[in-house]
Amino acid sequence: MSKTIVLSVGEATRTLTEIQSTADRQIFEEKVGPLVGRLRLTASLRQNGAKTAYRVNLKLDQADVVDCSTSVCGELPKVRYTQVWSHDVTIVANSTEASRKSLYDLTKSLVATSQVEDLVVNLVPLGR
């Protein structure tokens, strides 16, 4: 059974299904709906060289179709994913589960603020 992630935004629900998984990286893609606009999420968890910290990276890409009739990629259109969002978190390796949960809660709270929404949506620097 494939793993899935369900994203609920307003009235819409979008389901991403795991298509690839390794020890430190998973890729989830949207499999239903129009091809243009489908989402792909890449999640990775890697330890730094000194093994003192972990880096969590989430990257969201959105599908578009490239017209190949006028280029060298052949006759048929091809799907191209373009990064539309990413989020990086660094976690101290010897942290406790409680401190990591607190970091997660703080991150979730920060991203939900109107100031961060204004920064992301309207490109208004924080504090202005």
UniProtKB/Swiss-Prot annotation:
Main localisation, per the record? virion
Give the GO molecular function terms. Answer: identical protein binding; RNA binding
Q: Which GO terms describe its cellular component?
A: T=3 icosahedral viral capsid
* Function description: Capsid protein self-assembles to form an icosahedral capsid with a T=3 symmetry, about 26 nm in diameter, and consisting of 89 capsid proteins dimers (178 capsid proteins). Involved in viral genome encapsidation through the interaction between a capsid protein dimer and the multiple packaging signals present in the RNA genome.
Q: Does the keyword Disulfide bond apply?
A: yes
Any idea what this protein is called?
Capsid protein
* Source species: Pseudomonas phage PP7
Name the keywords, alphabetized: Capsid protein, Disulfide bond, RNA-binding, T=3 icosahedral capsid protein, Translation regulation, Virion
* Residues given in the record as RNA binding sites: R40, R46, A53, R55, K59, D61, V84, S86, T90
Record bears the keyword Manganese: no
Provide a GO biological process annotation: regulation of translation
Concerning its family, UniProt says: Belongs to the Leviviricetes capsid protein family.
Please spell out the taxonomic lineage of the organism that makes this protein.
Answer: Viruses, Riboviria, Orthornavirae, Lenarviricota, Leviviricetes
Location of the protein in the cell = Virion
Per UniProt, subunit arrangement is:
Homodimer. The dimers in the capsid are covalently linked with disulfide bridges. The homodimers binds to the viral RNA via an operator hairpin, but also to many other RNA sequences in the viral genome; this interaction probably shifts the virus from the replicative to the assembly phase and ensures specific encapsidation of the viral genome.
Quick one: effect of changing T90 to A/V? Answer: Loss of translational repressor activity
Q: State the superkingdom.
A: Viruses
